[in-house]
Amino acid sequence: MQIIKIMLAAAGLTALSLSCFAQEEEAPTRYTYATYYSCGGGPLARADEIMADDSDRMNGFVADGTLAAWGWMAHHTGGQWQRISWYQADGMDALLDAGDAIQGTGDDDADDAAAEEEDDGPGFGMICPRHDDYIWQVQNGANSDARGEVGMSVYHVCDVSREERADEIVDEHFAPVLNKMVKDGKLSSWGWQSHVVGGHFRRLQTMTAADAKSLMAARAEALEVVYGEDNAAGEEFTAICGDHVDYIWNAQLESN
C-alpha cells in the first residue's frame, strides 16, 4: 500500500526541518508538497507503522532523483494537525511528476510497488480521515549535516499586498541571524517558504534542532534578536505577518 498515493488521489493533487535548503539564484526553485492530517479514528502508532512500511519505496524516489527529499512528522505541541507527510522536488514540473510517480499514475515505467499493499489504505484513512494540502515554494534557509530530530513550524497569515516585503525582511534581517545559529550548531536547519496552493496560511517558517530543549532555547535566542526592543524590521514584519499558528513536530521518517 502506498498511503501517500491514496491521500493525494483523494485530494485530487491540488496543483511539505521541517527539510529546506538555501538556493543559489541559478538553481531550480525547490517546492514542497505537504499534507497535514487531522486524525482521531484509531491508533496513531498504526498510521506511523503504515508510513514506515512504505519508507523504502519513498527512499527509492530520493535515490533515483524523483524526489529531493521526503519526510513524515508526528505532532508534539500546538494546533489541530497531528501528522505531516511532505516531499520536495526542484521545479514545479518535477514536483507534479513526483506526485504522479508516488500515485503510480506516471508513465509506463512507473513503480508498480505503489499498488502492492492497497488493502492498508482504508486503515490509514480511518485513522486520519481529514487533511489539508499545501504547495510551498522554498524562499530561503540553511541546513547542516546534523539531522534535526525536533522541528518547529510557524504558519503565518499575512497581508497579501505586502507579503513580498516580509520576504525581504527575512532575507535581510532574519536570515543572517538564523544562518549563524545553524553554523554554530544551535539549529540543525531553518527555512522560509511561500504559499503556492492551499489554505489561508501565506508563509511557513521552520527550524529544527537536536531535541526539544535545544529547539526552544534557539528559538528564544532568535526571537530576542529579531524582535527585540527597538527592532524596526521585526515590528514591520509583525505588521505584515502578525497572526500565526505554532507547531512542534517530532521527525519520524526522513530522507534527502
Where are these regions (language model features)?
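Positively charged n-region of N-terminal signal peptides that target proteins for export
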Residues: 1-6
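Bacterial N-terminal signal peptides
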Residues: 7-17
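Short S/T/G/P-rich N-terminal loop/turn motif that feeds into the first structured element of a domain
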Residues: 22-256
